[in-house]
C-alpha cells in the first residue's frame, strides 16, 4: 500500500495516517519447539539413550549406506518425510560422536 500524500487529488490522495502493524498470530508458532521443550528432549535423549531401531539405523548408515536406513526408518515411522528427518538426525549423531 502506498503512502498517502494528504492531498485530495492524485494517485496517493487521502489523509496521512500511520499504519498499524499487528502482532503475528500465535497460531503461526505451532510446531516450533520452545527452549524448555528443546532442553527437556535433549535431557531425555542423554539419559535414556537411543532406541533399538535408532541404533539399527546408525549401524545401517555406517555399513550399507543411507538408502536401506531410510527404508527401515519409513517402515518404523510411517512416512518418508519423517524417515528422512530421522536419518538426518542419526547422521548428526554419528558426526557428533566422531568429533568427540
Curated annotation (Swiss-Prot):
Post-translational modification: N-terminally acetylated by acetyltransferase NatA.
Residue positions, PTM N-acetylthreonine: 2
Pfam families found in the cross-reference section: Ribosomal_L36e (PF01158)
Keywords: Acetylation, Cytoplasm, Ribonucleoprotein, Ribosomal protein
Disulfide bonds: none
Keyword Coiled coil: no
GO biological process assignments: cytoplasmic translation
Subcellular location as annotated: Cytoplasm
InterPro entries, per database record: Ribosomal_eL36, Ribosomal_eL36_sf
Family, similarity comment: Belongs to the eukaryotic ribosomal protein eL36 family.
Assembly and binders: Component of the large ribosomal subunit (LSU). Mature yeast ribosomes consist of a small (40S) and a large (60S) subunit. The 40S small subunit contains 1 molecule of ribosomal RNA (18S rRNA) and 33 different proteins (encoded by 57 genes). The large 60S subunit contains 3 rRNA molecules (25S, 5.8S and 5S rRNA) and 46 different proteins (encoded by 81 genes).
Protein name: Large ribosomal subunit protein eL36A
